């Protein structure tokens, strides 16, 4: 075999990513549920046949899933090896959602399929899709007051859902007997399997063209280069230990904050992440399983060094000490529905807060840091059927050294977007009375945070139950280097004309609603970066003109005094205000 040349290596790198991209798009375009088809709450990747380590991921999937899936794939491989799982055959697809076996929360359902070359497994393809319901005590699975994982839904160890390409009717029946709106899941299941089959076909085309040995050599070289590049980036960071803290509002059961304490030690070309001092395992659903904790650290560093190609090699210089005895290393039966969408973002926030001290030009202030999980389940009398609606929302990104934060961006753990209002109103008996930018929510700074989202949903028909598992309701996203925090999450429910604010601010379950009742949500703005008094006064004037801040906020937050109805800057008054 000829030595692998640079051009072939580059072509194969792009080809492997393209396989994953096509799997992502197939999954979304064929899926039934809006959360997958419209919001893209899914991901696909290619994983090592030896240990499940990440080979490639698509650019269209949730990055946190791809990092996690290397652990769930590894678990499938290990359970097959020790006889706890039936051995694979061509065409088999395993299903698993057990959080403690390399997962996230129960709603994130993983499929894993071996790709054979002859009689040997060449690699594994795996994907994750967020199912709108997985059973449990409340529609949507976000049980804010759950104290055990069984209350959150059906937990599946790795089992064959497809055998030699055929859906197993018995396993399918067990699943359907334990979830809501089960008749709608077959569309998502078929889409999830189809994505893997497309990936298998495209990967076999690459292997047939270039040869198995060449592709294996390319995979090894890409992993080596990713590790080398990450090490080079780390080596440029000043040696030392950087400390930070981030806070979870509450666990949904005990109304007290949870602390993420982080020390990042940089030595040579490695970073060591130590969460010693973080809160102990909690009673409610804001525990994080180890796979999610690890993936959250990796993803945060991916934000800081986006130039590093993503593969298992990129993670090698990142050493995460296992946070045993804390809520970041959940063990059965701790509930975990808040881990993937909320706690993972607090972990990333802690990483950002530590690393901005070392790399102020590369790291932003804290982003919104909440996926805005809002689940609504009920019966639509006009259609004569039950439904489960799942709404996720964007928020403001943190400001950085050169720019203001992005407004209404997706969460930092992925690329999920809010489903279009028109799709939600068509699919469910709801009306969006208001859907707009949340003015004033961005944290003040030399570069302000981006703004969150404000929306209000009215129930049009029938009875329903609402549940929320969000975060940043008590603490807004942190500012950096003198910047101010962004505005926190806000949830208000109007029942029979009476206003109700959840005691845990961003978490509650099973709130009964009737036609005419409304839910109002305001998502967080991003943290500000740098001293607000150093912000260009002309930018403050522009923000006021656009309606982002009031004239009063311009003076209070930025020290900019406006005159003539907010149309011009009073330079002398501004100088006095900023001088204190």
What is the predicted function of each stretch?
Residues 1-90, 98-117, 121-580:
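Glycine/proline-enriched, intrinsically flexible loops and inter-domain linkers
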């Amino acid at each position: 075999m000829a030595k692998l040349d640079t051009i072939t290596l580059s072509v194969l790198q792009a080809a492997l990513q393209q396989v994953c991209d096509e799997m992502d798009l197939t999954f979304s375009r064929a899926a039934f549920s809006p959360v997958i088809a419209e919001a893209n709450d899914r991901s696909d990747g290619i994983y090592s046949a030896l240990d499940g380590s990440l080979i490639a991921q698509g650019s269209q999937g949730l990055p946190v899933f791809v990092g996690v899936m290397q652990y769930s794939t590894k678990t499938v491989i290990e359970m097959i090896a020790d006889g706890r799982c039936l051995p694979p055959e061509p065409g088999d697809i395993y299903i698993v959602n057990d959080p403690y076996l390399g997962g996230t929360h129960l709603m994130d359902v993983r499929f894993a399929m071996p790709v054979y070359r002859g009689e040997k497994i060449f690699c594994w393809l795996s994907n994750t899709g967020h199912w709108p319901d997985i059973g449990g005590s409340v529609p949507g699975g976000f049980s804010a007051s759950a104290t055990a994982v069984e209350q959150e839904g059906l937990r599946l160890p790795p089992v064959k859902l497809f055998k030699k390409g055929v859906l197993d009717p018995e396993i399918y029946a067990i699943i359907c007997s334990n979830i809501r709106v089960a008749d709608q899941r077959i569309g998502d299941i078929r889409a999830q399997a189809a994505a893997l089959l497309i990936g298998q076909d495209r990967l076999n085309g690459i292997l047939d063209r270039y040869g198995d040995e060449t592709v294996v050599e390319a995979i090894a070289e890409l992993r080596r280069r990713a590790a080398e590049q990450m090490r080079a980036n780390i080596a440029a960071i000043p040696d030392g230990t950087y400390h930070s803290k981030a806070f979870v509002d509450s666990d949904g059961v005990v109304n007290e904050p949870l602390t993420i304490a982080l020390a990042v030690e940089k030595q040579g070309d490695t970073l060591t992440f130590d969460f010693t001092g973080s809160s102990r395992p909690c009673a409610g659903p804001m525990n994080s399983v180890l796979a999610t904790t690890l993936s959250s650290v990796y993803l945060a560093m991916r934000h800081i060094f986006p130039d590093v190609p993503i593969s298992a090699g990129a993670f090698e210089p990142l050493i995460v000490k296992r946070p045993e005895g804390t809520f970041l290393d959940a063990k059965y039966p701790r509930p975990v529905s808040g881990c993937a969408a909320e706690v993972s973002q607090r972990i990333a926030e802690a990483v950002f807060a530590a690393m901005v001290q070392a790399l102020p030009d590369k790291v932003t202030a804290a982003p919104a840091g909440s996926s805005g999980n809002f689940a609504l389940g009920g019966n639509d009398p006009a259609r004569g059927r039950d439904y489960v609606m799942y709404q996720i929302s964007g928020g403001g990104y943190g400001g950085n050294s050169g720019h203001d934060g992005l407004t209404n961006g997706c969460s930092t753990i992925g690329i999920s977007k809010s489903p279009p209002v028109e799709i939600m109103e068509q699919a469910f008996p709801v009306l969006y009375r208001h859907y707009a930018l949340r003015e004033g929510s961005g944290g003040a700074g030399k570069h302000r945070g981006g703004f969150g989202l404000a929306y209000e949903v009215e129930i049009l028909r029938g009875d329903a139950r609402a549940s929320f598992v969000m975060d940043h309701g008590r603490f807004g996203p942190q500012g950096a280097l003198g910047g101010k925090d962004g505005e926190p999450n806000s949830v208000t429910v109007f029942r029979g004309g009476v206003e109700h604010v959840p005691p845990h601010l961003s978490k509650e379950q099973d709130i009964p609603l009737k036609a005419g009742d409304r839910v109002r949500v305001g998502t967080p703005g991003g943290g500000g970066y740098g001293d607000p008094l150093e912000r260009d006064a002309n930018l403050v004037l522009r923000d006021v003109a656009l309606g982002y801040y009031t004239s009063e906020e311009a003076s209070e937050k930025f020290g900019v005094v406006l005159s003539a109805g907010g149309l011009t800057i009073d330079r002398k008054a501004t100088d006095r205000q900023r001088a204190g």
